[in-house]
Amino acid sequence: MSVNLNNKKESWYMFKIGLVIAFSAVLAACSGGNGTKNGEALLTYGNEAPTLTQNPEQLDLLIFGGTAGVGLETVKLALARGHKVTSVSRRPERMTLEHDNLNNVKGDFVKSDSYASFIEGKDAIISAIGVDASSEKITIYSEGMKNVLKAIGSNSSTQVVTITGIGAGDSKGHGGFFYDRIVNPFLLEEDYADKTRQEAILRSSQSRWTIVRPGFLTDDVSETRYRVLFDMDGVQSGDISRADVSHFLLAVVEQGAYINETVFLSN
């Protein structure tokens, strides 16, 4: 009987995923892509996108989840800017890049012994991991961050940057009607519950941390016209490209900027 109940639960969850994906496609086709604050464009709110300097000092970076999405874009940009990169992922064979300054290794965000030998001496650690939507409790973000902080030690000068998103902490309820009422509660509730826990763990730590909450991610090219906001009051998220998120991440670690800050990024 328990097997049948589990099968029914899984079938119902897959049906919800299909329904939300269909609605999401319609929504994406109608979306203007720009965020708002109190109904106005974000153009005059928050900070402009930072400017990357020419010929930055070489950094030694560790990136979790560097084989896809924002993580891969960040690896690409970091290498292009002359940095050393260690990409840690569960499936390193998915890496599409080869570079003299790239160390592509197998590791698990929640198992510090799988990456402990690579973490010493790193200038910054960036977490760009993601997991599939699930109705089961998710703990990878919070448990993984606990282990990362333990691995670097309380007196480390290493900057720790993590990507969460709209739905974590006080950003919940700022994604627009469809996202807030359908996508988040139906598909992403467990995901963002754990991202919220991860944010709390970082804030209570003694590390040099930065929490980055990007808006709705796209595969567009980088235009660096996004805004950097601190206050979510009256804000509704827009889009931002993964390339633009990587641009911000590199600015943060190169300039030592936004230390102990939680920021929201959106066009």
What are these regions, as identified by a protein language model?
Residues 103-122:
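Conserved Rossmann-fold cofactor-binding substructure of NAD(P)-dependent oxidoreductases
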Residues 61-81:
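N-terminal Rossmann NAD(P)H-binding glycine-rich loop of SDR-like oxidoreductase domains
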Residues 194, 212, 240-250, 261:
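Substrate-positioning beta->alpha
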Residues 28-29:
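C-terminal motif of bacterial Sec signal peptides marking the signal peptidase cleavage site
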Residues 199-221:
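Conserved beta-loop-beta element that borders a ligand/cofactor-binding pocket
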Residues 132-161, 197:
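NAD(P)-cofactor binding segment of oxidoreductase domains
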Residues 205, 221-226, 252-261:
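Glycine/proline-rich active-site loop of Rossmann-fold NAD(P)-dependent oxidoreductases
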Residues 88-93, 109:
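N-terminal Rossmann-fold cofactor-binding loop
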